[in-house]
Amino acid sequence: MGYFWFPWFSAIFVAVFSYYIWQWTFWRRRGVVGPMGFPVLGVFLNSLDNNFPFPLQCREWTKKFGKIYGFTEGTLKTLVISDPELVHEVFVTQYDNFYGRKRNPIQGDSEKEKRTNLFAAQGFRWKRLRAISSPTFSNSSLRKLYQTVEDSALELLRHIEKQSAGGKQIDMLKFYQEFTLDVIGRIAMGQTDSQMFKNPIMPIVSKLFQGNFAKLFLIGGIFPTFLVEIIRQILLKNLKVGSFRKINEITLDAIHNRIKQREEDQKNGIEIGEPADFIDLFLDAKAEDVEHFGENNGDFSKSTTYTNRQLTTEEIVGQCTVFLIAGFDTTALSLSYATYLLATHPEIQKKLQEEVNRECPNPEVTIDQLSKLKYMECVFKEALRLYPLGAFANSRRCMRNTKLGNMKVEVGTMIQVDTWTLHTDPNIWGDDAEDFKPERWQTPNSDQIYQKSGYIPFGLGPRQCIGMRLAYMEEKILLVHILRKFTFETGAKTEIPLKLIGRATTQPESVWMHLNPRN
């Protein structure tokens, strides 16, 4: 009996093995250079090394293979580019062909998720979410959030004064994470006051960012799509409540409580006041022209009438949750890198403090004063150039067969920008590309010139980060208050250069600083 089944098992094994070898050699068969990795796995194992972030690995491969190369991650095929013309073609010129993001199949189909967020959505649904959400990040909306952000900044300043007393070094990364979580908690998750250094959400969020999803992504990268979806549904039904689900539940409770409060106020004849946070803004948000958007067989470029101009409760949960995930780590890291660079370049820090003294002479700092801090903007831009912390987000998925340069690109191919190489390319930035030089941003039209050439810390094109202005507002408010009272100085615990770690984002292991009180 065993001999009867042996040929069948052998044939199946050979067929499966041949299939994976065929996938593994995809780029080689097309004459595209790149790292091969291992059969079946490709370079998947490289993406799991927390001590050598994958964006830095891509930078090393670019040095070896050039500005365009390919690799496989299981059955996923990725083309890496760092040529500014190709980047502009993918993100802007051919946006209609590359409007999807790079996703692992284990993450599911974003179009079928009730809580799909603006980052993951694509096509018609992305257009609708973007249209409804955009007013939430307008200047007028940010003004309504300003006082909450500044209150959190002043609360952090009190903790800094206490913890750094007596010349003690403090890890600014941890302090900045407390600040950004406090802000997001208050403007997106229904938190009513500051919970800094006692926030019950912090362990949940930290666990989410420190989580190892390697096994899940391995399943998504290796197994056929239909099997991945079956496994995914089983996991969703049987997994214990994880960090992501806990955050969703906290947000959903906050939204339901806000809706209930609004209904009670209306019954009692109480008018709804000015929006206090994202929940209020999203509940009020409408897009007048959303009826012009539509869906036609999944093709976002063809429209039919769709009249739901407001977000559903589930969609509000999705937006608030993704803003927590996107805003917590990235803003804290941007502040951390800027702090490190200022401490290691005291002449630049002194120049920035002079601007702060000049433009913000009074204890109260207004949102209009922030717009006058031009040199501070240059400092943050330059910090994000040298440390593009969210480089993984600069990726796209090919949605239609097309050509990129002279290369044919098939549907399903992932495009990943090597942002670290792009941001320090001497052909773009000059011989001082590796230097921290905020003054390079003071040249006329520098924003337009550099973005066209390849400066993309917040992405590029229609899908550029919607929260960019909020992030800058948070960073400016906090840095103004700190630099008015302290000067950042390195100490015995400061790692120079920084030791970089991470998977989803590239972050320093720590940013220990002395905060020397100013006269």
Swiss-Prot record:
What is the purpose of this protein?
Cytochromes P450 are a group of heme-thiolate monooxygenases. They oxidize a variety of structurally unrelated compounds, including steroids, fatty acids, and xenobiotics.
Q: Which UniProt keywords apply?
A: Heme, Iron, Metal-binding, Monooxygenase, Oxidoreductase
Superkingdom classification of source: Eukaryota
- First-tier enzyme category under EC: oxidoreductase
In short, the EC number is 1.14.-.-
Which Gene3D superfamilies does this chain map to? Cytochrome P450
SUPFAM superfamilies membership: Cytochrome P450
Q: Which PROSITE patterns match?
A: CYTOCHROME_P450
- Which PANTHER family does the UniProt entry name for this protein? CYTOCHROME P450, CYTOCHROME P450 FAMILY-RELATED
CDD domains in the record: CYP3A-like
Please indicate if the UniProt record lists Ion transport as a keyword.
Answer: no
Which cofactors are required for activity? Answer: heme
Protein name, please? Putative cytochrome P450 CYP13A1
Q: One matching Pfam family, short form?
A: p450
The positions annotated for binding heme are C465
Q: Which family does this protein fall into?
A: Belongs to the cytochrome P450 family.
Gene encoding the protein: cyp-13A1
InterPro entries membership: Cyt_P450, Cyt_P450_CS, Cyt_P450_E_grp-I, Cyt_P450_sf, Insect_CytP450_Detox
Which GO MF term does the entry hold, naming one?
monooxygenase activity
